[in-house]
Amino acid sequence: MNILLENGKPKGGKWSHDKENRKKIPKNIDVPIFRNFKDTTHTKDIKKIINRVFPDNYGETDDFNYPTTRKTALGMLDQFISEKLNEFGDYEDSVDGRSPFWFHSVLSPLLNIGLIIPDDIISRVLKKKNIKINSYEGFIRQII
């Protein structure tokens, strides 16, 4: 793939930046806003399927807030890249009750159902300039 490399060596001088990804979330940091998605023609059907197939799973579909089209999935990806990616690495392993997602992308469900593919993510991230190396490396490694 020839990413995370510079002249055959790891970008940033090391293969993993995990030690830099364990910062505690400061008390005065703004909680990133998780985008609200409008219901589409698919949303009602998706909720019915989830309730029928997974009746005993945790959670409710009343607050279903995920993209249901490729266009909105790519929009969610673009929002993550522009608003959250740079801080992702610093707080990648942090847990704090003020937000369930913080700087995470929440793209896994969209990958799992095929609304986006890893190449969509990686190609867009590679175009973004001035990303902190620990965010870049940590996120790309998760996608790969």
Q: Which residue ranges define each predicted feature?
A:
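Beta-rich, aromatic/charged-enriched effector core domains that present basic-aromatic interfaces
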Residues: 1-69
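Gly/Thr-rich phosphate-binding loop signature of adenosyl cofactor/nucleotide-binding cores
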Residues: 75-78, 82-144
